A protein has these predicted regions:
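Residues that define the transmembrane beta-barrel architecture of outer-membrane proteins
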Residues: 25-27, 62-66, 100-104, 134-140, ...
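Sequence/structural signature of outer-membrane beta-barrel proteins
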Residues: 48-56, 87-95, 126-132, 166-172, ...
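Start-of-domain marker
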Residues: 20-76, 81
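Residue-level signature of outer-membrane beta-barrel architecture
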Residues: 35, 74, 88, 110-112, ...
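Transmembrane beta-strands of outer-membrane beta-barrel proteins
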Residues: 43-45, 82-84, 119-123, 138-140, ...
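Short loop/turn motifs that connect adjacent beta-strands in outer-membrane beta-barrel proteins
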Residues: 39-41, 79, 113-119, 148-158, ...
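Bacterial Sec-dependent N-terminal signal peptides
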Residues: 1-25, 225
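Outer-membrane beta-barrel "beta-signal"
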Residues: 108, 213-225
Length: 225
């Protein structure tokens, strides 16, 4: 209970500290299904919903979008992998004036686990297509995962998550946009095939031109089939 009050207090302080600038708060639940085709090749399907609960000094709950995504991943060895993905974002049904988006993604990932902490670096290139424009986004993500009990994450145990991401978006219709994201959270291994994760992510959106502050509360269930 003390931890809950502390988290709520931090959220309120964050909201108050940036209230004079653009600030938005989101809740983002998702479910992720993954299965291995072979020892080196796997598929991943994700359904994700985004709800806005705070928008510039106003608390109001509205669904913003729904995402459907698929990734195919090929492991090159124990440390390196490549992947391609496709995603469709439904926004027109929820927000007036917004457009649905088709997104293609290419990914390279490098991960190591020298001791109890796993380190992961990920590069992504994305092509984001709407009815009015096409943009290209480039992403670098550094993430850590660490077991809370012992050298490995066993069934019934918790683990901590942290990540830092830098993004650049370019298009013919607007100036380059830079974004910074930082997140931290905790996960639990409920069984051999199910994990739950709760992550708080803070984003600085377009911080070189039109700075916006965004706070995401992300909850996810990962299921291995």
């Amino acid at each position: 209970m003390r931890n809950l009050f502390f988290i709520v207090f931090l959220l309120m302080v964050t909201i108050d500290s940036v209230a004079q600038e653009s600030f938005k708060g989101y809740f983002e639940p998702y479910i992720d299904l993954e299965y291995d085709v072979t020892d080196y090749y796997s598929h991943e399907f994700t359904v994700e919903e985004r709800t806005i609960w705070y928008n510039n000094n106003s608390f109001n709950v509205d669904v913003k979008q729904l995402d459907l995504a698929h990734f195919s991943t090929l492991a090159l060895d124990e440390k390196n992998s490549v992947a391609v993905g496709v995603q469709y974002r439904f926004e027109e049904n929820f927000v007036t004036g917004e457009e649905n988006e088709l997104r293609f993604t290419e990914e390279y990932k490098y991960s190591i686990q020298p001791k109890v902490t796993e380190f992961e670096q990920r590069l992504r290139a994305e092509q984001r297509i709407t009815s009015s424009s096409t943009s290209h986004r480039f992403r670098y993500n550094f993430a850590i995962t660490r077991a809370l009990n012992g050298p490995e994450i066993d069934t019934g145990e918790a683990y901590i998550i942290g990540d830092l991401e830098i993004l650049l978006t370019v298009s013919n219709t607007s100036k380059p946009e830079y974004e910074q994201r930082i997140g931290a959270g905790i996960g639990w291994v409920l069984s051999d095939s199910i994990k739950l994760e709760f992550v708080t992510e803070y984003r600085l959106d377009d911080f070189t031109q039109d700075l916006g502050h965004e706070l995401f509360l992300v909850t996810g269930m990962k299921v291995g089939l």
